[in-house]
Amino acid sequence: MQNFGKVAVLMGGFSSEREISLDSGTAILNALKSKGIDAYAFDPKETPLSELKAQGFQTAFNILHGTYGEDGAVQGALELLGIPYTGSGVAASAIGMDKYRCKLIWQALGLPVPEFAVLHDDTDFDAVEEKLGLPMFVKPAAEGSSVGVVKVKGKGRLKSVYEELKHLQGEIIAERFIGGGEYSCPVLNGKGLPGIHIIPATEFYDYEAKYNRDDTIYQCPSEDLTEAEESLMRELAVRGAQAIGAEGCVRVDFLKDTDGKLYLLEINTLPGMTSHSLVPKSAAVTGVGFADLCIEILKTAHVG
């Protein structure tokens, strides 16, 4: 096996997704240790990143979700320290965290995305409701794990929802409702893995459904996708990742409309690795267990 030296599993951090990061990090740490890797937990909220060098770490497995973790900040710090790390580089991480600018790139390249509008204090909210229709989704551009995602149903409600959300990270986006199903497709080292059909018991795949409930159904391989649709989803996931320069292990989320058309929703350049997480479920279908998946991701560690 490749010699990774002393490995820091970066977990926790400062964002609203701290607890999820700790859960993922603990699972990864245990998996790496089970494979004989000299791995240790490292929480930047408790210990400055500069201590990585002082403590002799040679590789970083980054599982810091959200702000300062997957937005390019910690990636830049690791570049300066010269420590190889897993995941995407600075630019791709920053773009992937910004749903608005990621959508602009995908649109420019002709990839299918749901129609959307960026909201501001002076937005004509009635006009946006008319353009996108109801219901619609409203979300902050730079939060993850469905933090701040609201389904707007009632006419005239858009402005008040915007006022509730505008303190969150990034622009606030209103997005056309696509009602044919929710899917996700991981990409590992430029190769699409089996897609997952997500069937939440809640109204949509929100934070509660992702992390706290046990009644969300995950179909992998998906029972309602034809072979051609599955192939297209994987192709679009790979193209979506390549469009922003994402590397290593990422996950692209999709919506399907009632006519069967697939839309790229967003990309997660640092997907979760908990017992509820989608990437391990998809990898398992291909015969790759959790510990082996962690090793494959660790092999992608890089600088620059």
Curated annotation (Swiss-Prot):
Residues annotated for Mg(2+) 1 binding in this entry: 253, 266
Cofactor, how bound (note): Binds 2 magnesium or manganese ions per subunit.
Localization in the cell: Cytoplasm
Residues binding ATP: 129-184
UniProt EC number: 6.3.2.4
PROSITE patterns in the record: ATP_GRASP, DALA_DALA_LIGASE_1, DALA_DALA_LIGASE_2
Residues the entry annotates as binding Mg(2+) 2: 266, 268
Domain of life, per lineage: Bacteria
Cellular component GO terms held in the UniProt record: cytoplasm
Keywords, comma-separated and alphabetical: ATP-binding, Cell shape, Cell wall biogenesis/degradation, Cytoplasm, Ligase, Magnesium, Manganese, Metal-binding, Nucleotide-binding, Peptidoglycan synthesis
Pfam families given in the database record: Dala_Dala_lig_C, Dala_Dala_lig_N
Required co-factors: Mg(2+); Mn(2+)
Annotated TM spans: none
Function: Cell wall formation.
Name of the molecule in the record: D-alanine--D-alanine ligase
Organism (species): Neisseria meningitidis serogroup B (strain ATCC BAA-335 / MC58)
